[in-house]
Structure formats: structure tokens, C-alpha cells
Amino acid sequence: MSDNSQKKVIVGMSGGVDSSVSAYLLKQQGYQVEGLFMKNWEEDDNEEYCTAAEDLADAQAVCDKLDIHLHTINFAAEYWDNVFEYFLAEYKAGRTPNPDILCNKEIKFKAFLEFADEVLDADYIAMGHYVRRSFPENDEKPQMLRGLDSNKDQSYFLYTLSNEQIARSLFPVGDLEKPEVRRIAEEQDLITAKKKDSTGICFIGERKFTEFLGRYLPAQPGNIETPEGEVIGQHQGLMYHTLGQRKGLHIGGRKGGGGNEDPWFVGEKDLERNVLIAVQGKDHPMLKSEGLLASQLHWVDREPIRDVMKCTVKTRYRQEDIPCTIIPIDDENIKVIFDEPQIAVTPGQSAVFYKDDVCLGGSIIEQRIKYSQA
């Protein structure tokens, strides 16, 4: 048995294939493995869409198969206070938050880690995220790298982690491609081998986003206008729309000036007037940004920067890396200038920075720097 036999790892068991294979791999590596299933949302009795019971059953079946103990914990109160209330406040302010990033920060790598540490006496926690750790020579501080499977890389969602959290966390599937993960699950006859990956915001599930949000925030219908002020439609609430959005405007059949038949996109939200500004064509100047201003800056493995820095940035998940220049304003606020103008830069979302495969950190987009030709 390897030296790992004296190390206890608590695996976040979600009922999905990634956490299932993570638990299997860690056991193969000789660790003392136990599972912990988190319930982060209290569904109503009539909310049939919620899969928590099914996910727990799948997690239990996997743990039984692997002969590991499964603990359960309810973090619904922490989730409501630290994630969901922020989510609502951001939408109420006309911004577009990313609750999955905050869930990782406040729940999976904070509340979960604290419980595993203080109650279960863990040496490490482990998650089924597609990221990797690296320990540079002569430096005990670990870095976070993109997952080997570029299509599944989740470093964008984990940029808020600290060196200390990364050092205490294992990511067994980060070195694997997704098809390999499923192959291992099938070989081990795990019930989750062919289970569909979860998508969307965890507490909304498969239900329509507008229906869910409307339960918590009153909708405020208003006009959809062109940049020139012509009313061309109605929206049901600014919170239901995001910059660069094409679908859901319900003005698709309307021609613009001069018979322009290009599709319509959300170009701007006028919060003061409760008006949605729509523009035609994906190359419209109003959709473009030269850069952004961001706050809540967090570096994974470095002190706050004092000088201008070149790197790449993602302003949304699955986006190609954008070469950029970071100009520090103070320890928590920065200005980012893109090498080339970008579309759909959205306040409330995260700008995450990279040097090659290393995730450097990230920040919350406060406002975009509009294209000077717009």
C-alpha cells in the first residue's frame, strides 16, 4: 500500500459520473476514502424538477459499490445566505451573476472543507472538477491549471480558490478526458456511467429560468427600442436578458432600417428607463467592448500586482482566450484592455485570467469599456 494509506480524503459525491470516478481513483491510489453528499437547496413539495433524492440515491449506490461510507450534510441555509441572496440582488440590479462560481467559493471549498476538516478529520477533500494542480519547483504554493480535457475545463469556475484551498483539494479527473472517465465508470459498473451531465444553474434544474426568477423578483415589463429610440417591442423584465443575447426578444421577423434583415441582439440595458436597447447584426458596434472595469480581484498564487501585466482573459465560460493588458487601479480593482474588441462583455460575470495553462485568478466585471466607434 502506498503512503496515501494514512491520508483521509472526503469526496464531494454529487451523484454524477465525475465524482463517482474520482472516488474510485482515489481508492485505487490507496487513500482512506469517504463520501459527503451536500444538499444545497430546499425544494418545495410541488417542485418535481429537483433531482436531489435521485442524486443521493445514485451517490449511495456508488459508495456501496466502492465500499466507502457516505455522509450527508445540508448546506441549504448557507447556500441561501451566501449564494442565492447575492444572485437575486445582482439580477435586481440589472446584472448577470454566475452563482456556480460563488457556490464553489462559499459552499464546496469553504463550508464543505470546514465540515470535512472539523467533523470528519480529513487530510484532503476531493471534487469531480476538471482542473489540475501543479507545485512549481522550490515553491510550496500550488498553482491551478486548466483541466486536460479543454472541452470540460472548469478552472473558470474555480478562480476564487486560495493556495491553501488548492493544497487541501484533489481533482482526480482533471488529468483525464471525459470519455475516459465514462469508460472507467462503465468498467467498474458504476450506476452513474451513462448519467447525463447536469447543466444550468443547480437550484433551477430543468425548469424555465423566467418562471423561476419571477417567483422571487417582480417582473417589470418595458419597451424594446432601437438606439435611435424607435419602439420595436416589449420585454417582460430587464433581468431576463443579458448583453449580446439573441433568442427570446420576439422581434425576429421585424426588418430594421433600409430593409435590414439581420437578427436582433441585446445591445444595452437602460436601467433608469427600464428599456432594452436592441441592435441588428452580430457585428454591430454597440455589442463590442474595448475592455472592462472589474472589482473583487482575486489572485490564486500571487500578491496584488503593481504594474501593467499582459496575459489572456475569458469573460464567459467556453470562450476562447483573449489577449489583454491588465492595468491595476488598486488591490481590488483593475482596468482590462483587450488586444481586439470583444462582444457580450457582461457586468456581473467574471473575467478570469490565464498564463498558458495556469489560472492566475479573476474578478467581477463592473462595466464594459464601450467600443470607441459605437
Swiss-Prot record:
Keywords assigned by UniProt, alphabetized: ATP-binding, Cytoplasm, Disulfide bond, Nucleotide-binding, RNA-binding, Transferase, tRNA processing, tRNA-binding
One CC-aspect GO term: cytoplasm
Enzyme's top EC category: transferase
Subcellular localization, as worded in the UniProt entry: Cytoplasm
Region ranges (Interaction with target base in tRNA): 98-100
Sites annotated Interaction with tRNA: 129, 349
InterPro entries reported in the protein's UniProt record: MnmA-like, MnmA-like_C, MnmA-like_central, MnmA-like_central_sf, Rossmann-like_a/b/a_fold
Pfam families given in the database record: tRNA_Me_trans, tRNA_Me_trans_C, tRNA_Me_trans_M
Disulfide bonds: 103-202
Residues annotated to bind ATP: 12-19, 38, 128
E.C. numbers: 2.8.1.13
GO MF, one annotated term: ATP binding
Any single biological process term in GO: tRNA wobble position uridine thiolation
Entry function: Catalyzes the 2-thiolation of uridine at the wobble position (U34) of tRNA, leading to the formation of s(2)U34.
NCBIfam families given in the database record: PRK00143.1, trmU
Sequence similarity: Belongs to the MnmA/TRMU family.
Name of the protein: tRNA-specific 2-thiouridylase MnmA
Gene behind this protein: mnmA
